[in-house]
């Protein structure tokens, strides 16, 4: 019988885990432990729905489908900021401040996050409502979608009733992954992380918002004075004590020279941030002085946003090449004269699809403007038409696949052209490269160049052929000596023991990513069970939507897939889930239960992944950084700063041999 006290305890534990991971960026547990606690919580909620509150961590995963977004009136208007584009604008702003309140001033300088301004309401410390800025007076209610952002606490550390303002955003890495998925699926790409964040928060299906990995920084309260603080900087510190995520890169500046230094610093460093910023915000720090300055109808007189100039670089578009992805999507790529953009040299940029090329009237031979979307992905902004000479050539997508000559099609609701020939050599080659990649079967020594050689020499035609390669055939490859071939064959052999989720992800089933593959493997345990699953069963699993379920059913209905799986079985490839199931182990077996272990340096007998998997299978958590919460540091050769920090904190340091003694005998390691 479920215990309500245990239920409340689980909520507090999961809230703390989320705070550690998403707010202060100091994870204290591994995903497996978090997932285990969440599953326990979900089982209790299923048995006792009357206990569930809006603050439950289970509400973060989405699932609610909204009918629309109702209007919300802000108690205090969400004003926009006036802009400064140069130092003269900042000097004028500073002069107006000094003329009004005198020279005893300071400015809190903060990074201007390029996202979507939102408002969060807490009542007695509990998250009540979230809204967009809208026109500043009336916004849209996006309470459910904001709840899916893990860095937004559902309960504050104190029972305040406050309205907090902040910027929701999509980290660069999440943006890149999202666009890669959308491109593979033939969907329109988001132009930048800001648009992606805004689009995600306006999804009627909250599961979609939850899948987008959004984040937030909070930067103000509707009225800081209600919190008993006298300065904006003290107010930000107070927000942190409440468990809210505030950007750490803020600085209190006493004069304009310090402000300029801060701007110069972040103009240089912004490309290295994990999120987009488009400027610096200055705020008069003293709250009483803010009140003296007042506001205009649109913006406060005590704050201003300095906007970074956009880095747009001209270069020549030499050609447009076509690439065929593993799912058949045809992607046009701009071949450019190499040019430096946002810190790196760019020679190629995706043009995404034919519609975009037509819309922007991009021609071969044009001088084009280049920037990096999210400071990561090279993007052609536009052609500089006034520099055309008449020699430029319009581009037209072909009607047939550039690799296999099959007719290209545009599927319903897709903007991309796609080759649907399952025997297309380009798709097979890309599928092979994906199959051996690190997140899939992780076969060391079998990189893209080796795959291309094997494929072009007709030594492999599908993924099963990899497991029947002989030493003699591999020695025929360029730059493959005796030692390289021996190591490669050992790596191929070792990959046969991978757990089911690795194989599933490697097979490249459309719409099935690494996370979904893990969910499928854990649920079905064997490939045979998964093969016969129907759509209803599949959609009952977390992370599996209707589109993905349809794709899985279609995939396993293919006779060629059945033949491929039989060949993989014949090769000895494991088709069962072999990951840790902590709930089935005794306390005596879980020798690392509750302990955090850090691995550093080069291990001789174990690979890093093997050591991590073994520690986790015995209840331990493997962390990437050393802190006071670390229980053991395992140091191999060439250990660096982590070892030094462990010594400084007096944390026990083990050798690899010490670790092996604590582990079960795996493949003769203890001999």
Curated annotation (Swiss-Prot):
NAD(+) binds at residues 31-35, 80-81, 110, 133, 167, 283, 307. It catalyses: NAD(+) + (deoxyribonucleotide)n-3'-hydroxyl + 5'-phospho-(deoxyribonucleotide)m = (deoxyribonucleotide)n+m + AMP + beta-nicotinamide D-nucleotide. GO terms for molecular function: DNA binding; DNA ligase (NAD+) activity; metal ion binding. The active site is at residue 112. Zn(2+) binds at residues 401, 404, 419, 424. Residues 587-671 form the BRCT domain. Disulfide bonds: none annotated. GO terms for biological process: DNA repair; DNA replication. Its cofactor is Mg(2+); Mn(2+). CDD domains: BRCT_DNA_ligase_like, LIGANc. Its EC number is 6.5.1.2. Keywords: DNA damage, DNA repair, DNA replication, Ligase, Magnesium, Manganese, Metal-binding, NAD, Zinc. It holds the Pfam family DNA_ligase_OB. One of its GO terms (cellular component) is cytosol. Belongs to the NAD-dependent DNA ligase family. LigA subfamily. DNA ligase that catalyzes the formation of phosphodiester linkages between 5'-phosphoryl and 3'-hydroxyl groups in double-stranded DNA using NAD as a coenzyme and as the energy source for the reaction. It is essential for DNA replication and repair of damaged DNA. This is DNA ligase.
């Amino acid at each position: 019988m479920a215990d309500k006290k245990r239920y409340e305890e689980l909520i507090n534990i999961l809230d703390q885990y989320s705070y550690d991971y998403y707010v202060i960026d100091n994870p204290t547990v591994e995903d497996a432990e978090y997932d285990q606690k969440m599953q326990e919580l979900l089982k209790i909620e299923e048995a006792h729905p009357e206990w569930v509150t809006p603050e439950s961590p289970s509400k973060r995963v989405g699932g609610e489908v909204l009918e629309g977004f109702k209007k919300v009136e802000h108690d205090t208007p969400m004003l926009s900021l006036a802009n400064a584009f140069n130092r003269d604008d900042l000097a004028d702003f500073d002069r107006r401040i000094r003329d009004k309140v005198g020279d005893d001033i300071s400015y809190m300088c903060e990074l201007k996050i390029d996202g979507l301004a939102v408002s969060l309401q807490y009542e007695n410390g509990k998250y009540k409502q979230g809204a967009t800025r809208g026109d500043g007076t009336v916004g849209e209610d996006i309470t459910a979608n904001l709840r899916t952002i893990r860095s937004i606490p559902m309960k504050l550390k104190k029972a305040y009733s406050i309205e907090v303002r902040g910027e929701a955003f999509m980290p660069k890495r999440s943006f890149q992954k999202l666009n890669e998925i959308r491109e593979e699926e033939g969907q329109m790409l988001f132009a930048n992380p800001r648009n992606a964040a805004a689009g995600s928060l306006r999804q009627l299906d909250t599961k979609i918002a939850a899948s987008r990995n959004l984040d937030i920084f909070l930067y103000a309260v509707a009225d800081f004075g209600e919190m008993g603080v006298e300065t904006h900087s003290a107010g930000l510190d107070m927000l942190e004590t409440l468990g809210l995520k505030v950007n750490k890169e803020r600085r209190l500046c006493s004069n304009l020279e310090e402000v300029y230094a801060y701007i110069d610093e972040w103009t240089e460093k912004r490309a290295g941030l994990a999120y987009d910023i488009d400027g610096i915000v200055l705020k008069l720090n003293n709250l009483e002085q803010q009140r003296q300055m007042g506001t205009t109808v649109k913006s406060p007189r005590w704050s201003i946003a300095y906007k970074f100039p956009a880095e747009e670089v001209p270069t020549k578009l030499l050609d447009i090449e076509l690439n065929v992805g593993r799912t058949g999507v045809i992607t046009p790529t701009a071949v450019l004269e190499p040019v430096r953009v946002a810190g790196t040299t760019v020679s190629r940029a995706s043009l995404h699809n034919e519609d975009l090329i037509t819309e922007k009237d991009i021609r071969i031979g044009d001088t084009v403007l280049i920037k990096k979307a999210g400071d990561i992905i090279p993007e052609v902004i536009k052609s500089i038409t006034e520099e055309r000479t008449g020699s430029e050539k319009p581009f037209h997508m072909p009607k047939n696949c550039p690799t296999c000559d099959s007719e290209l099609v545009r599927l319903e609701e897709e903007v991309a052209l796609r080759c649907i020939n399952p025997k297309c050599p380009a798709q097979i080659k890309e599928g092979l490269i994906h199959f051996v990649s690190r997140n899939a079967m992780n076969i060391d020594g079998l990189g893209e160049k080796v795959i291309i050689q094997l494929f072009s020499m007709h030594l492999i035609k599908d993924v099963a052929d990899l497991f029947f390669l002989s030493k003699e055939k591999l020695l025929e490859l360029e730059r493959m000596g005796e030692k390289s071939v021996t190591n490669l064959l050992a790596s191929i052999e070792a990959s046969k023991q991978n757990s089911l989720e690795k194989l599933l992800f490697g097979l490249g089933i459309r719409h099935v990513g690494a996370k979904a593959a893990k969910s499928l493997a854990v649920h079905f345990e064997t490939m045979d069970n998964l093969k016969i699953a129907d759509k209803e069963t599949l959609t009952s699993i977390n992370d599996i939507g209707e589109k993905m379920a349809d794709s899985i059913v279609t995939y396993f209905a293919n006779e060629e897939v059945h033949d491929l799986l039989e060949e993989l079985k014949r090769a000895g490839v494991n088709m069962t889930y072999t990951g840790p199931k902590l709930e089935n182990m005794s306390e005596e077996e879980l020798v690392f239960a509750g302990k955090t272990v850090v691995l550093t340096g080069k291990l001789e007998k174990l690979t890093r992944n093997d050591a991590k998997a073994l520690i986790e299978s015995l209840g331990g958590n493997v962390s990437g950084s050393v802190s006071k919460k670390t229980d053991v540091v395992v140091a191999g050769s060439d250990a660096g700063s982590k070892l030094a920090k462990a010594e400084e904190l007096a944390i026990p340091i083990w050798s690899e041999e010490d670790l092996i003694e604590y582990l079960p005998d795996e493949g003769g390691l203890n001999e």
